[in-house]
UniProtKB/Swiss-Prot annotation:
Protein's recorded name: Transcription factor MafB
InterPro entries assigned: bZIP, bZIP_Maf, bZIP_sf, Maf_TF_N, TF_DNA-bd_sf, Transcription_factor_Maf_fam
Keyword Transcription regulation on entry: yes
Gene from which the chain derives: Mafb
Domain bZIP: 238-301
Subunit text: Homodimer or heterodimer with other bHLH-Zip transcription factors. Forms homodimers and heterodimers with FOS, FOSB and FOSL2, but not with JUN proteins (JUN, JUNB and JUND). Binds DNA as a homodimer or a heterodimer. Interacts with the intracellular cytoplasmic domain of LRP1 (LRPICD); the interaction results in a moderate reduction of MAFB transcriptional potential. Interacts with PAX6; the interaction is direct. Interacts with ETS1 and LRP1.
Purpose: Acts as a transcriptional activator or repressor. Plays a pivotal role in regulating lineage-specific hematopoiesis by repressing ETS1-mediated transcription of erythroid-specific genes in myeloid cells. Required for monocytic, macrophage, osteoclast, podocyte and islet beta cell differentiation. Involved in renal tubule survival and F4/80 maturation. Activates the insulin and glucagon promoters. Together with PAX6, transactivates weakly the glucagon gene promoter through the G1 element. SUMO modification controls its transcriptional activity and ability to specify macrophage fate.
UniProt crosslink position (Glycyl lysine isopeptide (Lys-Gly) (interchain with G-Cter in SUMO)): K32, K297
Family indicated by similarity: Belongs to the bZIP family. Maf subfamily.
Organism for this UniProt entry: Rattus norvegicus (Rat)
Main location: nucleus
GO terms under cellular component: nucleus; RNA polymerase II transcription regulator complex; transcription regulator complex
Biased composition (Low complexity): 54-76, 175-203
Xref: CDD domains: bZIP_Maf_large (cd14718)
Length: 323
């Protein structure tokens, strides 16, 4: 039977081989079941192991019979589909034969390849993936079975294929720990922005010496931010505080200057108004003197004319005579 199982991955197509596979009966393989109480009690390690290069048709009578035996070949032989199906059927009967309703005839049909894989096999694949996931979270669940002291090296390279596959997929602890050890050294120096800022500060000197007071006051905020690219945050904050102080000082000086100018303007206007008032007063006094002079003259003329009219009223040459 080992010679038949050592065939290549391609199944034979000759009628003789197909007839042999059809006559192959898996019902004669019985599995010895251990009671539940004995399965829960820790047992001693197995003393009898399956010899390499042979396929076990019946479970061993040792305490390891609760663990389904797997076919193991020499390292040079390639694992075939027959080995997968045999291990899958044996593991399925050991775990729970009534759970998926899988019969040996289904395994034979899947082996022949004339029909697609039945639904119970697909269900078993899901159950096996869940079983692998359970073993992933609990890496030592088989310690409760008898003969749990047997290591992976004693059982051979094909004893637990799913565990072997899982260990190949997972990275080794040394490789997982090496990035963590390299993390502190991944950033040996400051970032590129800090380096650029240090270079700009070292080449151009202090940022306060780069701009004059007039430039800081007259420069807009957007233009200042464009010139401050590459400097450190402390230098930018200090320069903006200086700019704010200069602008406040300039605003205060401007207000003071405006107040002084307004004061001078008001004083000049006051002086001019006082002078105008004095001029108006002088003009009023002059007009008052002229008024008085004209009044005196008018009175004199009135008195002199009355006397002349009284003396010439009877003569015919006077105007009043003809009237």
């Amino acid at each position: 039977m080992a010679a038949e199982l050592s065939m290549g991955p391609e199944l034979p197509t000759s009628p003789l081989a197909m007839e042999y596979v059809n006559d192959f009966d898996l019902l004669k393989f019985d599995v010895k079941k251990e009671p539940l109480g004995r399965a829960e009690r820790p047992g001693r390690p197995c003393t009898r192991l399956q010899p390499a290069g042979s396929v076990s048709s019946t479970p061993l009578s040792t305490p390891c019979s609760s663990v389904p035996s797997s076919p193991s070949f020499s390292p040079t032989e390639q694992k075939t589909h027959l080995e997968d199906l045999y291990w899958m059927a044996s593991n399925y009967q050991q775990m729970n034969p009534e759970a998926l309703n899988l019969t040996p005839e289904d395994a034979v049909e899947a082996l022949i390849g004339s029909h697609p894989v039945p639904q119970p096999l697909q269900s078993f694949d899901g159950f096996r993936s869940a079983h692998h996931h359970h073993h992933h979270h609990h890496p030592h669940p088989h310690h409760g079975y008898p003969g749990a002291g047997v290591t992976h090296d004693e059982l051979g390279p094909h004893a637990h294929p799913h565990h072997h596959h899982h260990h190949q997929a997972s990275p080794p602890p040394s490789s997982a720990a090496s990035p963590a050890q390299q993390l502190p050294t991944s950033h040996p120096g400051p970032g590129p922005h800090a380096a650029a800022a240090a270079t700009a500060a070292g080449s151009n000197g202090s940022v306060e010496d780069r701009f004059s007071d007039d430039q800081l006051v007259s420069m807009s905020v957007r233009e200042l931010n464009r010139h401050l690219r590459g400097f450190t945050k402390d230098e930018v904050i200090r320069l903006k505080q200086k700019r704010r102080t200069l602008k406040n000082r300039g605003y205060a000086q401007s207000c003071r200057y405006k107040r002084v100018q307004q004061k001078h303007h008001l004083e000049n206007e006051k002086t001019q108004l006082i002078q105008q008032v004095e001029q108006l007063k002088q003009e009023v006094s002059r007009l008052a003197r002229e008024r008085d002079a004209y009044k005196v003259k008018c009175e004199k003329l009135a008195n002199s004319g009355f006397r002349e009219a009284g003396s010439t009223s009877d003569s015919p040459s006077s105007p009043e005579f003809f009237l």
